[in-house]
Amino acid sequence: MNTYTLYFDGCSKGNPGRAGAGAVIYDSAMIEIWSSAEFVGTNSTNNEAEYTGLLIGLRKAVEMGITHLLVRGDSQLIVRQMNKEYKVKSASLKPMYLEAVELSKLIDQITYQHVYREYNKRADELSNLGLV
């Protein structure tokens, strides 16, 4: 059993404003095997950008056939929503959350973990690249 790790992040300049998202997947030896930086939009919130980062990472993990995944992000809100500790109240986040839940069901073992920003540097770098 190989456990892969997905780090995700999002950023918004203005909140709402111009936003980018990033995600990176590491193999069980913590070697980067995939990464993505995406432009989210010109009127997006930070939380929408964070969910976008999560979704692009989850979609890729499913596409790669990953069965054991540790998901780490520095957004306490999103991690707690995915762990069902917080309800999703925002109408704009609800469809993103529901898609993330459905994608998570396609992975045999998935764990969501909050990490501090300093442990999420690569995904943060990618989310800022998504702004360009």
Language model regions located:
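RNase H catalytic domain
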Residues: C11-N15, L55-S127, L131
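Residues at secondary-structure transition points
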Residues: N43-E48, T52, V88-A91
